[in-house]
């Protein structure tokens, strides 16, 4: 999801900054809907094809796709909110999402007896759903007026292609090492096309979570 949104993140941030400078804030929220639509179409198509060949069960595939779609919208919303310097709102949404995910995970797995993989996937998706809802609520509060084409931001993507490529290459640089480790001696096949490296993934995940609210 971060790879998909990384291509659009910097041009979108520039678009928001330009519209605010020109005092055309009513154009911002429509562009958020357009950016989400484009990224969801591209991302869900590609990730859906991966899931079909991945060996995941139907339920696991649906949960993964649901989580992926939520993440795309969350990362996009964070790009808009960081352009507004609304860091406090992002932090509150992140904390609420963590609490909801842990609570739902405990309830689903340890109380209701849902299988571990499906239960924790659903809990994570629920947590990010909370973050998504709070982020979108913040955006609607900042930009109550809506006017203009939802596709206007694409002009900025075309105009600032170097920014788009910079974002994409930055993301690949940040996460390519994970694929290298998964395919190396530490890597294990979890299921089908899903690979991991527990000795590396756990500290890498904790390090990522510690800077998550600053990555937009």
Language-model segments: residues:
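Residue-level hotspots within the lipid-embedded alpha helices of multi-pass solute transporters
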Residues: 2-6, 64-72, 94-98, 125, ...
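Hydrophobic/aromatic residues in alpha-helical transmembrane segments
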Residues: 8, 12, 77, 104, ...
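Membrane-water interface segments that mark the loop-to-transmembrane alpha-helix transition
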Residues: 8-48
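Membrane-helix boundary and inter-helical linker elements of multi-pass secondary transporters
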Residues: 21, 83-84, 110-114
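Alpha-helical transmembrane segments and their helix-entry boundary regions
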Residues: 27-28, 86-93, 120
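Alpha-helical transmembrane segments of multi-pass membrane proteins
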Residues: 36-40, 49-81, 91
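Hydrophobic alpha-helical transmembrane segments
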Residues: 93-140
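Transmembrane helical elements of multi-pass membrane transporters/channels
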Residues: 123-144, 150-216
